[in-house]
């Protein structure tokens, strides 16, 4: 970039400067550091951080520690129906292992997602369970739990409907939660890594997951191996606030990294795999 270009970049109004940042980040193979962006645009790192924060909220780039990376294909929020046909065997195994952690008389929280829905299905199948209260903000999960009524009491949080996930979010989603002291929350996300913990691609869903987890004495993350090593826009729960991860289809290295960070990992399909997790071919 020439001296003239630097001068022009430094004097750009915020929208044009942010467009330039997106262009630089999208053209890079990996992380673009804040300092490099500041130098390229002829502006301060403080200004670049403010721009990155705004662009992250708009889901135009993904902010990470030290800079930004372009949005990958996995950073697009996908409909529940689309994700429901992926990793079905792994999700069913996770559901059964997670359901084994529940005892009669407990209050359980299930958030939105196809893996929590698998937990719901496994809970219903456990005919030994009685007097279980399940709190959820997922219409899909609530319907999956209906066959267990009256053995189970199913509480739907209320809130504002998001059709993409058939979920209930703020405003009003959190109104009932201060009255609930749950034993365990089973929470999912779109990413799980050591640096950020559990993350999710959508901010309203992230906030809902946060609020649900906060009602419970224990947080159990349910995530198949495809979620490991990914970080998305919203931080749901840092690793230090996660009690257990229940997974299937994860590599040995991925499981080892989470365990090394001090989090218990339950491998639901008998043991870590040496090959990367792949999509389940069963529709």
Language-model-derived ranges and their functions:
Residues 112, 116, 138:
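Conserved SAM/SAH-binding loop
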Residues 119-120, 231:
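Short, Lys/Arg- and Gly-enriched loop/turn segments at beta-strand edges
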Residues 130-132, 245:
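Conserved helix-loop-beta element of the AMP-binding
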Residues 132-133, 154:
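Rossmann-fold dehydrogenase core element
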């Amino acid at each position: 970039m020439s001296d003239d270009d630097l001068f022009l970049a430094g004097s750009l109004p915020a929208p044009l400067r942010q467009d330039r940042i997106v262009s630089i980040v999208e053209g890079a193979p990996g992380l673009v550091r804040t300092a490099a962006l500041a130098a390229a645009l002829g502006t301060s790192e403080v200004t670049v951080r403010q721009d990155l924060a705004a662009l992250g909220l708009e889901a135009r780039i993904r902010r990470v520690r030290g800079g930004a990376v372009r949005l990958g294909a996995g950073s697009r929020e996908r409909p529940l129906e689309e994700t429901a046909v992926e990793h079905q065997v792994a999700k069913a195994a996770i559901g059964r292992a997670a359901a084994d952690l529940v005892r009669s008389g407990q209050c359980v929280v299930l958030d939105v997602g196809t893996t929590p829905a698998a937990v719901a299905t496994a809970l219903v199948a456990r005919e030994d369970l009685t007097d279980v209260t399940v709190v959820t903000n997922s219409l899909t999960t609530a319907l999956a739990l209906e066959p267990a009524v009256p053995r189970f009491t199913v509480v739907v949080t209320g809130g504002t409907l998001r059709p993409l996930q058939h979920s209930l979010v703020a405003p009003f989603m959190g109104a009932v939660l201060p009255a609930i002291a749950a034993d365990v929350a089973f929470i999912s996300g779109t990413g799980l890594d050591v640096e950020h913990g559990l993350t999710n691609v959508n901010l309203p869903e992230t906030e809902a997951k946060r609020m649900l987890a906060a009602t419970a004495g224990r947080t159990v993350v349910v995530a198949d191996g495809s979620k490991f090593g990914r970080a998305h826009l919203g931080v749901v729960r840092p690793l230090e606030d996660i009690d257990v991860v229940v997974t299937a289809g994860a590599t040995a290295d991925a499981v080892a990294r989470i365990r090394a960070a001090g989090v218990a990992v339950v491998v639901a399909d008998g043991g870590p795999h040496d090959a990367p997790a792949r999509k389940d071919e069963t529709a």
